[in-house]
Design a protein with these regions (language model features):
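Generic alpha-helical hydrophobic packing signal
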Residues: 3-5, 18, 51, 77, ...
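Short, surface-exposed ligand-recognition loops at beta-strand->loop->(often short) alpha-helix junctions
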Residues: 9-19
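Short alpha-helix boundary/capping motifs
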Residues: 19-20, 68
Length: 100
């Protein structure tokens, strides 16, 4: 299983736009092979900071969706409302030790 964490810093006054686009993107992700679930969290200390967490059956499933034209197009729409590029962290379960 894979957990993907995407951190975004939203420009002032653009939260409504970003939430609408992220909802649209989540609906599309739900129809992708290997997508398990997703959630969006807002920082308590900084409401302009969002963290999207999604779970996937495999890294291959996630990377296929991440690199798809459909997702790239929607992500480009989201980026216009961000202070900086989204930050991605990808984690895999049950692989210790990963390196020797």
């Amino acid at each position: 299983m894979v957990k993907v964490m995407i951190k975004r810093h939203i420009k002032d006054g653009k939260a409504k736009d970003v939430f609408a686009l992220l909802k649209e993107q989540r609906v599309k992700a739900m129809n992708q092979r290997g997508h398990l679930n997703g959630e969006t969290l807002m920082s308590y200390q900084n409401p302009h900071c969002l963290l999207v967490i999604s779970s996937w059956q495999s890294m291959e499933n996630w990377l296929y969706w991440k690199e798809s034209e459909e997702r790239r197009a929607n992500e480009a729409r989201v980026e216009q409302f961000l202070e900086s590029p989204a930050e991605y962290d990808e984690y895999i379960f049950g692989t210790y030790p990963l390196y020797n």
